Amino acid sequence: MTQSQVTPNAREALTETIVDAKVRKNLTFEAINEGTGLSLAYTTAALLGQHALPENAAKLVAERLGLDDGAVRLLQTIPVRGSTPGGVPTDPTVYRFYEMVQVYGSTLKALVHEKFGDGIISAINFKLDIQKVPDPEGGERAVITLNGKYLPTKPF
């Protein structure tokens, strides 16, 4: 039976345990994800408390991380999503995404509405990918793809 969390507390505590195990075992998220059949972004988000994992994936990652049966069950529960505490993020990496939305949010909204009409881009029917590519001017660049289904507003 599908279970749902009503507060972020249990998943936040599990996230701390997961990150500790990942560090102790010197694993990457990619290594933990291997064989789950899920995208790296989805599994990473689940391990950080933002998604539920299917039973087989929960068992696999728990085995890799040395987690108990309680953690396997908790990884399968529907979390309280978007539960980052504190409002405006203070972590520099997360803050840059917040800043990008602050600068380009109205542009994205205007262009989505111009191309699609009144509606939203789903974060439920959604895929995320990040690639590291060389910068022709030196260094590296991050190519981040946000691929969400367009959902039109339906008058009622």
From Swiss-Prot:
List of catalytic residues: 96, 99, 122
Domain of life: Bacteria
The protein's Enzyme Commission number: 4.2.1.104
Reactions catalysed, as given in the entry: cyanate + hydrogencarbonate + 3 H(+) = NH4(+) + 2 CO2
Record's keyword annotation contains Lyase: yes
Molecular-function GO term, any one: cyanate hydratase activity
Pfam family, one: CYNS_N
Keyword Lyase assigned: yes
Alphabetized SUPFAM superfamilies for the sequence: Cyanase C-terminal domain (SSF55234), lambda repressor-like DNA-binding domains (SSF47413)
GO biological process: cyanate metabolic process
Enzyme class, spelled out: lyase
Keywords: Lyase
Purpose of the protein: Catalyzes the reaction of cyanate with bicarbonate to produce ammonia and carbon dioxide.
Family assignment from sequence similarity: Belongs to the cyanase family.
Protein name: Cyanate hydratase
Organism: Burkholderia vietnamiensis (strain G4 / LMG 22486)
Gene: cynS
